Swiss-Prot record:
GO biological process, one term: protein folding
Main location: cytoplasm
Full protein name: Protein GrpE
Known role: Participates actively in the response to hyperosmotic and heat shock by preventing the aggregation of stress-denatured proteins, in association with DnaK and GrpE. It is the nucleotide exchange factor for DnaK and may function as a thermosensor. Unfolded proteins bind initially to DnaJ; upon interaction with the DnaJ-bound protein, DnaK hydrolyzes its bound ATP, resulting in the formation of a stable complex. GrpE releases ADP from DnaK; ATP binding to DnaK triggers the release of the substrate protein, thus completing the reaction cycle.
Keyword Cytoplasm annotated: yes
Organism annotation: Lactobacillus gasseri (strain ATCC 33323 / DSM 20243 / BCRC 14619 / CIP 102991 / JCM 1131 / KCTC 3163 / NCIMB 11718 / NCTC 13722 / AM63)
Localization: Cytoplasm
InterPro entries named among the record's database cross-references: GrpE, GrpE_coiled_coil, GrpE_head
Intrachain disulfide bonds: none
MF terms in GO: adenyl-nucleotide exchange factor activity; protein homodimerization activity; protein-folding chaperone binding; unfolded protein binding
Domain of life the protein comes from: Bacteria
């Protein structure tokens, strides 16, 4: 018999029987139930986004603070550069001042030498005045308590009394300060 002769009969191949029915996994069913609660997914996502937002906000605040610190450091460095702009020139001029002082230390015997010394003295005085106007001053050393920030001990001698201990007894080379910085420490002899 053919299918055409019995149209009301079904093809047994197409029929679903209990043993051919797709089996449902109980774990899959519970997963489907979990997926059905979208509120938990949104809460989790909100928590993650909040944490990420807090992290980004923290990074932003740190970056902003770092920028402010850099700007403050830049302003301070710029102020230091302006404050000490003449420092290198002053260091270059100090040896010339030393030479002028040495020239004045030589005894002048005749009138021509005395006139030359007078010119050297005027030049030195003018140079010292210009240095003072720029904030460059001589470090007071002789008779002062030895200060390693201002003095360089080249030699030590025995102190004649207790008051003289750790005091400068002789200056071998003058020292100079530029505002609050030591340009060149005074080379001194210290009593011990």
């Amino acid at each position: 018999m053919s299918k055409e002769e019995f149209p009301h009969e079904k093809d047994l191949k197409d029929e679903v029987t209990p043993d051919k029915a797709p089996k449902k996994d109980p774990k899959a069913a519970s997963k489907e139930e979990v997926k059905e609660d979208p509120a938990k997914d949104y809460e989790k996502e909100i928590a993650e986004l909040s944490a990420k937002n807090k992290d980004l906000e923290d990074k932003y605040l740190r970056s902003e603070a770092e920028i402010q610190n850099m700007q403050a450091r830049y302003a301070k460095e710029r102020a230091q550069l302006i404050k000490y702009e003449s420092q290198s020139l002053a260091k270059e001029v100090l040896p010339a001042m030393d030479n002028l002082e040495r020239a004045l230390a030589v005894k002048a015997d005749d009138e021509a030498a005395k006139q030359l010394q007078k010119g050297v003295q005027m030049t030195l005085d003018s140079l010292v005045k210009s240095m003072k106007d720029q904030g460059i001053t001589e470090i007071k050393a002789e008779g002062e308590t030895f200060d390693p920030a201002l003095h360089q001990a080249v030699q030590t001698v025995a102190a004649e009394n207790d008051d003289q201990k750790d005091h400068v007894v002789k200056v071998l080379q003058k020292g100079y300060q530029y505002k609050d910085r030591t340009l060149r420490p005074a080379m001194v002899v210290v009593a011990q």
